[in-house]
From Swiss-Prot:
Quaternary structure (record): Component of the elongator complex composed of Elp1, Elp2, Elp3, Elp4, Elp5 and Elp6. The elongator complex associates with and stabilizes microtubules; efficient interaction requires the full complex.
Listed GO MF terms: phosphorylase kinase regulator activity
Function: Component of the elongator complex, which is required for multiple tRNA modifications, including mcm5U (5-methoxycarbonylmethyl uridine), mcm5s2U (5-methoxycarbonylmethyl-2-thiouridine), and ncm5U (5-carbamoylmethyl uridine). The elongator complex catalyzes the formation of carboxymethyluridine in the wobble base at position 34 in tRNAs. Binding by the elongator complex stabilizes microtubules and promotes their growth.
Protein name as it appears in the record: Elongator complex protein 4
CDD domains (alphabetical): Elp4
Composition bias type Low complexity, residue spans: 220-237
Record InterPro entries: Elongator_complex_protein_4, P-loop_NTPase
UniProt keyword terms in alphabetical order: Cytoplasm, Cytoskeleton, Microtubule, Nucleus, Phosphoprotein, tRNA processing
Gene ablation phenotype (knockout): RNAi-mediated knockdown is lethal in larval third instar (L3) stage.
Length: 437
């Protein structure tokens, strides 16, 4: 017998690939620019936190990218939110670009449209060098989307989606009525009838005068023993029932309902760790908003994130959460580092809208800054870090761009400096001429 075994190559999960740097199975976040910043994509079993800006506009765009990538890759989707309508959010997902459109877009970007707007042209020998905003040059997975157009509704029918908005689940009225009729009949059974109303068993009818006093004493003694046994059984059953009752983990029942729905979906056989059937994308938008507030808000939120991380780690899934961290910091500043400790990636979006930087000439090209607060090493020794932590983002009509933050050239100031110097020299020469002795 030979020990030869034919090597079989298993097909990877749709929309995933093995990272050449860490040998991990990663999937795209939906935005090619964000994929390169975090090392090619999100590792399987990871949680990415997007800290929302004050107006909560840019984080929702990244959430739509995340969901749209799952639809194109035919991965199962779980979307939960209290602030947004999940069904409406799915209808407004961006349309994916075709291969020809993506090639045309890359060609236009290679020509340097930013330089054409400023009236500048780059030398021909530098055309092959990477641009300033070439953070996405090494991206190999994921798709490009057009934010101006919405995705075709037929694409959503081919994907399994689970929506959660804490709305009550109404059962079918017809099924409820039939179940109530079958479970509670109108005519009571013999066991439900009282003893005095139960029909006598034929052949056992006896007159009350024929009973002997000795038999009456025995019956009374037996009844007392039965009553004692029943009372002891009732007390024991109540004790065991109190011991078997589940502990209340959350004070807010919304966390329990959301976590139960997520865990029930992740228990599916297609998401078992080690199998390569499918991947589940869990997206939670505006978690920790004022709609979640109560007396035990901080305690319940920390418990929920802890249990969520344990659930996502043990199956083929990836999670994206958007949270209004600026509101949570006002509620309790100590919650911010705790929340970042319970996620794998913590990315803050600082928008320029409504601030002085919005009108500042140095920031006119950007919509805001991107801060990397946490980058975790999942099953690896080293953490991937981008070339520079100084990143900025642009929200254009058709796409969301993340690039290296740089200041514009000081053309106007440099041209104004020689004039000032010349005028200063002339004034000094006149002053020395007037001081001639």
């Amino acid at each position: 017998m030979t020990s030869f075994r034919k090597r079989t190559v298993q097909k990877p999960i749709r929309g995933t690939r093995t990272s050449p740097h860490t040998a991990q199975v990663i999937t795209s976040s939906g935005n090619p620019y964000l994929d390169v910043v975090i090392g090619g994509g999100l590792p399987m079993g990871s949680i990415c936190l997007i800290e929302e800006d004050r107006f909560m506009t840019h984080a929702k765009v990244l959430a739509k990218y995340f969901l749209a990538e799952g639809v194109i890759s035919k991965q199962e989707i779980f979307l939960g939110s209290l602030d947004d309508i999940p069904a409406e959010m799915l209808r407004r997902l961006p349309r994916p670009l075709t291969d020809q459109e993506s090639m045309e877009q890359s060609e236009v970007q290679a020509l340097g449209d930013a330089g054409a707007e400023n009236g500048l042209r780059i030398a021909w020998r530098y055309n092959d060098l990477p641009l300033v905003n070439s953070e996405h040059a090494t991206a190999k997975i994921g798709h490009h989307f057009n934010l101006m157009e919405q995705m075709d509704s037929m694409m959503l029918y081919n994907v399994k989606t689970t929506l959660w908005d804490d709305s009550p689940k109404h059962l079918d009225i017809v099924i409820d009525e039939e179940f109530s009729k079958s479970s509670s009949p109108t005519t009571p059974s013999l066991e439900q009838q009282p003893v005095e109303d139960a029909p006598p068993i034929p052949g056992t009818e006896t007159a009350p005068q024929e009973k002997m006093p000795a038999q009456e004493e025995e019956n009374s003694a037996n009844n007392n023993n039965n009553n004692n046994n029943n009372s002891s059984s009732v007390t024991s059953s109540t004790k065991t029932g109190s011991q078997d009752s589940p502990l209340q983990v959350f004070h807010n029942p919304r966390y329990k309902g959301l976590l139960n729905d997520i865990q029930q979906l992740l228990r599916n056989e297609s998401f078992v760790a080690g199998t390569k059937n499918n991947l589940c994308r869990v997206c939670l938008t505006s978690l920790g908003s004022p709609l979640w507030y109560d007396e035990h808000f901080g305690e319940d939120l920390i418990k929920f994130l802890t249990l969520l991380m344990a659930s996502v780690r043990n199956c083929n899934s990836v999670c994206l959460i958007t949270m209004p961290m600026h509101l949570i910091a006002k509620y309790d500043a100590s919650l911010v580092p705790k929340i970042r400790q319970l996620v794998d990636y913590a990315i803050e979006l600082e928008s320029f809208a409504g601030s002085e930087r919005e009108t500042h000439p140095a920031f006119k090209e950007y919509s805001g800054l991107l801060h990397l607060h946490k980058m975790s090493a999942i099953n690896t020794l080293a953490v991937h870090m981008p070339e520079t932590p100084d990143l900025a983002f642009k929200l254009r009509r058709k796409k969301f761009i993340i690039e290296k933050f740089h200041l514009p050239p000081e053309l106007q100031e440099s041209s104004a400096k020689p004039d000032n110097c010349i005028s200063g020299l002339l004034s000094n020469s006149n002053a020395t001429a007037s001081l001639d002795f």
